[in-house]
């Protein structure tokens, strides 16, 4: 099963090749760049090659694709009520009801969310990148705040990563115990890293991998906050990239 999530993971990596390295767009700032580069070197030159990447390779090579899809569907289904609320907060009740329908159908008919029944039944109900509370803040023009590279976590901003904590107050996420939340986060992280294994070469070939990772973070969250659209004034190749993402989604 090919998800828009996978398209975005690839697309946001490709976006950086033509993105500006400036940090004054849409409230971006990187006042701790020296510290962040040190943390980046730890995360991506120590933690990733010796721990994260080997786990992701084993996950990709030894876990059957149907099992991976099922676990991804299940963890994604847990977020559907929060996504619904965020769309309502953004003034988009139609998309809010789409995600309510996804949650209802997949929970009742899809074995608690392991099977994406809604997406298979109707193309308009296919899974998309989740809109979290940080995306809602971005939708209303709230700036990111300082960009930080955290050890064991990676890119962090107060708006998107801190703001997303608000989603934990909505059911079903509010029902998860701390170990359950950590397990969900770990599964999602391993799956995302496994999807990006084929893009490792792009990072290695970059003249400044830190800038590439930082700009990929901003581009991805801009894309989500803007409703899945790229603004041409911020990226002259926005329309071409938008078309490529649509082609990937249609496969």
Curated annotation (Swiss-Prot):
Name of the encoding gene: mlaA
Protein name, entry field: Intermembrane phospholipid transport system lipoprotein MlaA
Family: Belongs to the MlaA family.
Domain of life, source organism: Bacteria
Matching InterPro entries: MlaA
Organism: Escherichia coli (strain K12)
Effect of disrupting the coding gene: Mutation leads to accumulation of phospholipid in the outer leaflet of the outer membrane and increased outer membrane permeability. It confers sensitivity to SDS-EDTA.
Pfam families found in the cross-reference section: MlaA (PF04333)
GO biological process, one term: intermembrane phospholipid transfer
